[in-house]
């Protein structure tokens, strides 16, 4: 199991959903002989190692938490863990299709503004475009500028797209019908995504437009995990530079989050966190 955690730590290219499926598959590939002799304490330690390998990824935290919860139940934990892992993997594989189908039914728009790069957002937009003519305006999403790649992806999918500077989002909002964003994680404190997401949402609200997000339930985390990744570059000859990668948008600024279970309002989302159980093994580390 050490190898699984080490492989996860080295994975710098996969998205959160893909990481979950890869790790789940690796766990299910463990031989029956190895699985049956793993003590509960080793499963708990393994869960902690998975989280420490990717401490900002909600899908991995939820997998680790579920492994630890099953281990804490005692005898027979290995078989319960395998069944749970298989269920999570299958659910993750099906979730994007279900989210896209729900988004296509909910979003009645011909002009949509978005930002950054998200496979879930692209699937949702494809579902919308299959029902009505659609043009998408994509903020370039600095730092990183992955909005340009996303606009190219949409064009390759046959969806009309244009790119605008981030500073133009408010100026073009009067032409839009709604905004759509993805999410790296959702906690009781807000939706964490690429910086610029809140500006997009607030611009929509100021124009009386709906602000939708699309996100699988596997990204719902009872604790805030994502590091905002702020960098400061000093200079001896001129101004310093500061750059932030992620930001949190309060849940009440979003019209709804479209999940595989359909549209969830801010109050619905907060209700989802009531009664969420955290493994006691987390007490050994600083979350």
Describe the residue ranges of each PLM region.
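Alpha-helix C-terminal capping segments
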Residues: 28, 32, 126-131, 201-210
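Short, glycine-rich nucleotide/cofactor-binding loops
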Residues: 10-13, 111-117, 187-192
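Ligand-binding beta-strand-loop-alpha-helix segment within the catalytic cores
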Residues: 65-109, 113, 121, 126-179
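Conserved phosphate- and dinucleotide-binding cores of soluble alpha/beta proteins
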Residues: 139-287
């Amino acid at each position: 199991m050490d190898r699984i955690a080490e492989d996860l730590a080295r994975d710098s290219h996969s998205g959160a959903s893909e990481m979950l499926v890869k790790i789940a598959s690796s766990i299910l590939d463990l031989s029956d002989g190895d699985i049956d002799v793993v003590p509960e304490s080793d499963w708990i330690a393994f869960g902690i190692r998975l989280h420490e390998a990717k401490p900002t990824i909600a899908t991995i935290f939820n997998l680790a938490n579920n492994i630890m919860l099953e281990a804490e139940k005692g005898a027979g934990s290995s078989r319960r863990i395998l069944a749970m892992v298989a269920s999570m993997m299958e659910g993750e594989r099906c979730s994007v299709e279900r989210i896209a189908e729900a988004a296509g039914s909910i979003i009645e728009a011909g002009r949509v503004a978005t930002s950054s790069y998200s496979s879930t957002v692209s699937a949702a937009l494809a579902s919308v475009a299959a029902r009505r003519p659609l043009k998408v305006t994509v903020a370039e999403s600095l730092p990183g500028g992955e909005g340009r790649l996303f606009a190219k992806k949409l064009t390759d999918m046959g969806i009309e797209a244009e790119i605008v500077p981030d500073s133009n989002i408010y100026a073009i909002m009067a032409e839009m019908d709604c905004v759509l964003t993805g999410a790296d994680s959702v906690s009781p404190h807000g939706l964490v995504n690429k910086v610029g997401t809140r500006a997009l949402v607030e611009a929509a609200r100021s124009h009386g437009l709906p602000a939708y997000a699309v996100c699988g339930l596997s990204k719902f985390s009872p604790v805030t995990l994502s590091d905002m990744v702020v960098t400061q570059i000093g200079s001896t000859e001129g101004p310093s530079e500061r750059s932030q990668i992620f930001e949190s948008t309060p849940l009440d600024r979003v019209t709804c989050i479209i999940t595989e279970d359909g549209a969830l309002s801010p109050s619905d989302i907060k209700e989802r966190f009531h009664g969420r159980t955290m493994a006691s093994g987390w007490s050994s580390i600083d979350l």
